Design a protein with these regions (language model features):
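Tryptophan-rich substrate-binding surfaces of secreted polymer-degrading and adhesive proteins
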Residues: 422, 442-499
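Short beta-strand elements bearing conserved aromatic residues within extracellular beta-rich modules
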Residues: 396-398, 474
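Pro/Thr/Ser/Gly-rich low-complexity, intrinsically disordered linker/stalk tracts
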Residues: 362-391, 419, 434-448
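Sec-dependent signal peptide cleavage junction
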Residues: 20-31
Length: 499
């Protein structure tokens, strides 16, 4: 996302203080009538698009991403101050927007923003500075828009178990911030396509480099809006290359996140799909907002949305894997609110009206039976279960050893088990019409006492536990719950080598 700075001197503005005490509402419970959202970036600088005070942003927007929080000399500590108005006025503006159902999110990075987290000290500085800024101004969440410094190191080959310190520490830091604020905290991401969909053709350098971040934070992620611009073209699930700024491109790139894909073409290494409501498309508000291309006319984009959400074809080359579409797809993001205002509000007016008139297609059939049910014994006490998405499903039930658990996440972690015990699993899909039949059952056995477990993240290890990491055995010397970045090789206070 491009920006050119021109410093603006603070101006004196007045806002009634009562707004500071109005309640904050849910992120999707604003003044607009649809559950679809419009997310826009707001410039904390002047690049010739005009100055808009935060409180004067159009009510057509549901989420306002403030661009940008940026790092200071250590490249880890984040700073932010409003270039327009005073600190107090900015706080009051956020409080006012919250009072009318909007969310205001601090975006970090941008085209020129660099955040580097090579070690624990840098990670701590990042976490502390972010929490300080969020508390100071009352931000409702954070947006990760890092376009520099996110590159995989040479031996980092598994997106599920990353080794790149920058990525490992970023995941751990963002998770800590989200945990600090709880489930209503907004977490969004705005990577370029090379960092996400690019992982379909290669996993090295910046290609696919966001996949471990998305995977490591998918349980915290509110939504992701990949930038479908300044990209040229990308390869889709059908193996064809599509050009930015076309309906085919918008649909194809979005479905990669909705269906999942083999990383670097490896069918044994699948990036599993995100939930429909976690997927948003990022677009430029006008041609000038994306100098390297990607603008699409609203009339053409609406064809793409009709196909993506309703399954109504427009005669394009790309064919949806799920021909019925994805009605819970969440919405659109744009760079930027300021560019939209400069272009006579074409973006916000066109898409707000479209989304407000969107009606979920009626559900008339039960969902299909889930297929691809598989399980893996992670340890002596944990089995992970996953399955393919079922057509028409809005949720899933899991039958574990004959007991039904409703509305489970995919993948599902079955924990607190005993070693060498076998467990049975079946899954069914659910929607408003009813339930599918149960899938075929699978049997999975936990690891035995004699097995040396591979180290994993988010597992409770007790003093004396033995794990294997990169072919070396380690003994736990301090009870803890593991996190990405706390691998035995990195934490001598928690682990010691053993035979």
């Amino acid at each position: 996302m491009k920006k050119v700075f021109k410093r603006i001197f603070p101006i004196s503005l007045v806002l009634v203080m009562v707004f500071l005490f109005m309640p904050i509402t849910n992120v999707f419970a604003g003044s607009n009538s649809s559950d679809k959202i419009l997310v826009g970036y707001w410039h904390n600088f002047d690049n010739g698009t005009g100055i808009i005070r935060l409180k004067d942003v159009s009510t057509k927007w549901d989420v306002i991403n403030v661009a940008f929080g940026e790092s200071i000399g250590d490249r880890a500590t984040i700073k932010f101050s409003p270039e327009i108005g005073t600190d107090q006025e900015f706080k009051e503006d956020i409080a006012y927007l919250n009072s009318i159902g909007k969310k205001v999110v601090l975006s970090i990075g941008g085209q020129n923003g660099v955040v580097l987290l090579p070690d624990e000290n840098a990670k701590k500085n990042f976490i502390d500075s972010m929490i300080s800024l969020i508390d100071k101004y009352g931000f409702n969440g954070i947006d990760i828009d890092l376009e520099s410094g996110i590159n995989l190191i040479n031996n980092d080959k598994d997106f599920k178990n990353p080794k790149t310190p920058q990525i490992v520490n970023l995941i751990s830091a963002v998770r800590a911030i989200c945990d600090h604020y709880g489930p209503d905290f907004v977490l969004s991401m705005a990577p370029e396509t090379a960092y996400v969909q690019g992982g379909y053709v290669a996993y090295a350098g910046n290609w696919g480099a966001y996949l471990p971040i998305i995977h490591g934070l998918r349980d915290k992620l509110t939504y992701i809006h990949v930038q479908h611009y300044n990209a040229g073209g990308n390869t889709a699930l059908d193996g064809n290359n599509y050009t930015q700024g076309t309906a085919d491109y918008e649909v194809a790139m979005a479905e990669m996140l909705l269906q999942g894909f083999p990383v670097a073409g490896n069918a044994d290494n699948i990036f599993t799909p995100l939930k429909q409501e976690q997927v948003v498309i990022g677009l430029p508000a006008c041609p000038s907002a994306a100098p390297s291309g990607g603008y699409i006319k609203p009339s053409e984009m609406k064809k793409a949305l009709d196909y993506l959400m309703r399954g109504i074809p427009y005669g394009g080359k790309y064919k949806l894997v799920n021909s019925n579409g994805y009605p819970a797809f969440k919405g659109l993001m744009t760079w930027s609110i300021n560019w939209d205002a400069k272009s006579n509000y074409e973006f916000s007016t066109s898409y707000r009206e479209y989304f407000d008139n969107f009606k979920q297609p009626p559900v008339t059939e039960k969902p299909s039976i889930p297929i691809g049910l598989k399980g893996e014994a992670i340890s002596k006490t944990q089995i992970n279960i996953a399955w393919n998405l079922a057509h028409g499903a809005t949720s899933y039930d899991l039958k574990v050893d004959g007991n039904i658990i409703n509305n489970v996440n995919n993948p599902y972690k079955h924990i607190n088990l005993k070693p060498s015990f076998m467990h049975s699993y079946e899954v069914r899909a659910v929607n408003s019409v009813g339930n599918s039949e149960w899938s075929k059952a699978i049997i999975v056995q936990t690891k035995s006492e004699s097995d040396v477990e591979k180290w994993g993240a988010n597992i409770l290890y007790k003093a004396g536990d033995i794990v294997s990491y990169e072919g070396i055995n380690y003994r736990c010397i301090q009870t803890h719950t593991s996190l990405i970045g706390w691998e035995p090789i990195n934490t001598p206070t928690l682990w010691e080598k053993t035979n």
